[in-house]
């Protein structure tokens, strides 16, 4: 087991043993382009969804959107992230991460879940948090190094985009746009409010057993 790691935000809500490292997250405000529901039909008509089994927070987010918008849930089928197989026997597929850059979109209806969340709440969506296990003593220099690495990465986005674009098979410009303008890397007041709203709705719809407080390293817990 790791003592310090990024975890899906919903994982924090389900585990009372975690503390949050402040001022860092993987978040988005509006369109993100890498958490997508692709469908053969309109969202309100979807009856079955194939969900990438790695996408814990995204699955709960999608369920919240269905409950809030239509007061119902389709049937979720959990599977490996094979886009063609996912859509072959389901009305829609939840696709996340690098797979969203390459799948065929022609003739499909695409819903960006981060944009749908923003339209629903007006708040950012926090996809992942940097967490440490409670009672584990983490050297503050390690956290400072992580935050410094984040800042150095942001200062080097052009080169990172060039390298990653080649790996992903997309243009450097598309990669840079994603890293610069689609992803947010902090955990400020706006992100914390979005996280609280996510947990509140997840709890009210029965997707988590309790609504967690945001407990940070250094707080008196």
Where are these regions (language model features)?
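Long, low-complexity C-terminal extensions of enzymes
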Residues: 204-221
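Conserved beta-strand termini and adjacent loop/short-helix elements that scaffold enzyme active sites
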Residues: 7, 23, 77-81, 217-219
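Short, glycine-/small- and polar/acidic-enriched structural segments
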Residues: 1-45, 53-54, 58
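Conserved beta-strand segments of alpha/beta enzyme cores
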Residues: 19, 74-75, 109
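Secondary-structure end/capping motifs
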Residues: 138-201, 205
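Pocket-lining segment of extracytoplasmic ligand-binding domains
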Residues: 6, 78-164
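Bilobed "Venus flytrap"/periplasmic-binding protein-like clamshell domains
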Residues: 32-91, 193, 199
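Short, surface-exposed acidic
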Residues: 73-79, 169-180, 209-214
């Amino acid at each position: 087991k790791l003592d310090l790691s990024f975890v899906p935000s919903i994982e924090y809500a389900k585990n009372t043993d975690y503390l949050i490292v402040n001022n860092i997250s993987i978040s988005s405000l509006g369109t993100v382009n890498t958490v997508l529901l692709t469908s053969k039909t309109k969202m309100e008509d979807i009856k079955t969804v194939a969900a990438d089994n790695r996408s814990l927070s995204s699955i709960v987010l999608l369920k919240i959107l269905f409950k809030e918008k239509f007061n119902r849930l389709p049937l979720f089928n959990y599977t490996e992230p094979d886009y063609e197989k996912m859509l072959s026997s389901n009305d829609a597929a939840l696709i996340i991460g690098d797979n969203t850059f390459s799948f065929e979109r022609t003739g499909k209806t695409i819903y960006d879940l981060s944009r749908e969340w923003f339209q629903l709440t007006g708040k950012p969506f926090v996809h992942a948090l940097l967490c440490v296990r409670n009672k584990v003593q983490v050297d503050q220099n390690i956290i400072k190094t992580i935050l410094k690495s984040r800042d150095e990465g942001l200062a080097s986005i052009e080169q990172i985009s060039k390298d990653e674009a080649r790996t992903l098979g997309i243009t450097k410009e598309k990669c840079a746009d994603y890293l610069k303008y689609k992803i947010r890397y902090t955990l400020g007041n706006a992100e914390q409010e979005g996280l609280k709203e996510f947990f509140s709705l997840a709890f009210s719809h029965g997707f988590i057993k309790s609504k967690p407080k945001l407990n940070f390293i250094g707080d008196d817990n």
